[in-house]
A protein has these predicted regions:
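N-terminal accessory beta-strand-rich subdomains and adjacent acidic, glycine-rich linkers
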Residues: 30-296, 301
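Bacterial N-terminal signal peptides
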Residues: 11-23
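Conserved, mostly hydrophobic/aromatic
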Residues: 137, 345, 421, 448, ...
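Glycan-recognition and catalytic regions of carbohydrate-active enzymes
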Residues: 549-583
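Aromatic- and carboxylate-enriched substrate-binding clefts and catalytic-loop regions
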Residues: 356-525, 529
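An acidic-aromatic substrate-binding cleft motif
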Residues: 265-344, 348
Length: 583
């Protein structure tokens, strides 16, 4: 889109806010502040008049502009409209960020920042990197805030093609596992009544791509998007899960499910910063999987030393349904079976074994209970002698019930972490719970793998012991879904992986063409070639990565197994030599 000053002045008169400006005579009340990216290619113009808005440009092309920015409080106060500027200042920053267990050992973040504070007790920070832009609200001078809405809208003049991950929670889109393939659709084709979770990709003109996502999500709900054509253009509007007013506890796993919602999206301290809204920009598709804005905008490390946090591969039980063969003991969730997994891990240099769902009786919903078929202390001792570490699966809400007790007990026993599952929400109470889990686990030197989880939001910078995240349509789907995962697997690295690592759970050894593939729960197969499964260990970011198939199968294919186990899981640097979205 080329900028026409007259057109934009007319837009200003009609909508009482300026989306973008390159020239013309304006009223004195309109204030325009601009910053450029360090390489000079991007420019962000922030406009304050009756409302606060911004636009992001690349040369004379408007990439995106905003709807009016505001926070609406429960008492009716709206922070944004008619705000009076107290101070506006720009800074140039270069910082080196250690990034353990990430796709590179450190990040050099270079950006220009515009910080506008207002007399009404709030402000907005805008940051512009070579790789994109971000903004966040902050508030001051209040004891507490009850927020009922945040106005966050991303406006495009054209009906661009987008890669949309719809929430699959059709009855309640706020309750979902953040797993879906991408629907390729123009903004105007967004399905009515649905919401999309982040990240979401927009294909702009001239091969430019933009990924919308967020970072530093703490004590606040995650953002969903709703696409529609409005009088302002083609818009993705932010939607936020309210705080649940009523819940029910699912009887089998103890998962807490909302049954009603309040009008408030966040009850929080009055002096704080809010999540960064990110617009990551690429000229080449290969720039997207190594865009570091989400990590760089996360809150700094709160764990101190990270030397004790070890990445590695995992021999996993659940996907293959404990399906080992040729043994002289009953196969199942028992001590003998897990010793077999430990022996396999030790023989192949695999660092971890996960004890997935079933080691603790589900009916009790008590993480301190263990089924009689398993002796945990015996397994920890056995694994330790073979230089293998053990990780326990659990439901997040069940762990939270006895968090301090469980972390202390299992850490002292010798376990190295938890695979935490079935959150399936990103409202404020769940986000706060996950920070609580991560902090407590870190104090007891336990790593965390968040399954059933929303996308990474810089969490792994703040708590590096959180080493992996699901929020991905991973290989477990092949147990029950007919979806074609082969195209998906060459799309999501450019979108979801921009946000951070993926607990994809790869390594299926029974491989089938699309024609022959069909879901099998107990003895699943993987669509595509064996080489494709091996390649995922290089292409996908997985500091804690599963070998999902059973040890018996891997031992029959030792050449493939040995190749997989030699591939590193943490890197000093990541470079993408060639690639294209969807290919």
């Amino acid at each position: 889109m080329k900028i026409n000053p007259v057109k934009w002045l007319q837009t200003l008169a009609v909508f009482a806010f300026l989306t973008c400006l390159t020239g013309g005579i304006l009223e004195a009340k309109i204030k325009i502040h601009s910053i450029k990216s360090p390489d000079g290619k991007l420019e962000l113009q922030a406009v304050t008049q009756a409302n606060i808005s911004f636009c992001l440009l690349r040369g004379d092309q408007v990439l995106v502009s905003s709807a009016p920015l505001s926070l609406t409080l429960e008492d009716g106060t709206i922070l944004g409209p008619n705000a009076r500027i107290s101070k506006a200042r720009t800074t140039n920053v270069r910082e080196v960020i250690p990034s353990p267990l990430y796709r590179k050992s450190e990040i050099t973040a270079v950006y220009n920042q515009l910080d506008i504070s207002f007399r009404e007790g709030f402000g907005i920070r805008f940051r512009l990197y070579d790789q994109g832009a971000a903004y966040q609200f902050y508030t001051t001078g209040r004891d507490s805030l009850h927020i009922v809405n945040e106005s966050a809208g991303f406006l495009f003049e054209k009906d661009y093609t987008c890669y949309v991950p719809y929430s699959r929670g059709e009855a309640n889109p706020f309750h979902n596992s953040f797993e879906n393939v991408y629907t390729v659709t123009p903004v105007s084709g967004f399905e009515l009544g649905r919401l999309a979770f982040l990240p979401l990709l927009v294909c702009l003109d001239d091969g430019i791509k933009m990924v919308l996502t967020e970072s530093d999500l703490e004590s606040y709900p995650g953002m969903f998007l709703k696409g529609e054509k409005t009088s302002r253009g083609y818009e993705y509007r932010g939607v936020f899960a309210p705080i649940p007013s009523t819940t029910r506890t699912e009887p089998v796993r103890g998962q807490v499910i909302p049954t009603g919602y309040s009008q408030v999206i966040a009850r929080t301290t009055g002096t704080r910063s809010f999540p960064w809204r990110i617009m990551a920009v690429s000229e080449k598709d290969t720039e997207l999987p190594v865009n570091d804005l989400v990590y760089a905008l996360g809150a700094p490390n709160r764990t101190g030393s990270t030397d004790w946090i070890k990445p590695g591969k995992v021999a996993w039980d659940w996907w293959n349904n404990w399906g080992i063969t040729g043994v002289d003991f009953p196969v199942g969730i028992n001590t003998e079976t897990y010793k077999y997994y430990i022996d396999f891990a030790a023989a192949n240099g695999i660092e971890y074994v996960v004890l997935d769902e079933g080691w603790s009786p589900p009916a009790g919903q008590d993480i301190m209970q263990v089924i009689p078929q398993i002796d945990l202390q015996e397994l920890v001792t056995y694994a330790g002698k073979k230089n293998v570490s053990l990780i326990l699966w659990c439901v997040a809400y069940v762990l939270d019930e006895k968090l301090e007790e469980a972390c202390s007990f299992y850490s002292q026993m010798g376990f190295r972490g938890f695979k935490v599952d079935f959150m399936d929400r990103d409202d404020q109470p769940v986000v706060e719970m996950l920070y609580r889990l991560a902090e407590t686990a870190a104090r007891h030197r336990l790593l965390i793998d968040f399954h059933g989880m929303y996308k990474p939001t810089g969490f792994n910078r703040t708590y590096p012991n959180v080493v992996n995240f699901e929020g991905i349509f991973g290989l477990e789907q092949s147990k029950w879904s007919q979806e074609d995962m082969v195209p998906y697997d060459v799309i999501f690295p450019y979108i979801r992986m921009l946000a951070g690592p993926v607990d994809y759970t790869q390594g299926g050894m029974r491989n089938a063409t699309r024609q022959d593939f069909h879901p099998v729960y107990n003895n699943p197969m993987a669509a595509g070639t064996r080489a494709r499964q091996v390649a995922t260990y290089v292409v996908f970011d997985n500091p804690l990565v599963m070998l999902c198939d059973n040890p018996t199968t891997y031992m029959k294919e030792q050449e493939t197994t040995s190749f997989i186990t030699r591939i590193p899981v943490a890197w000093d640097e990541t470079r993408i030599l060639q690639g294209e979205l969807g290919k």
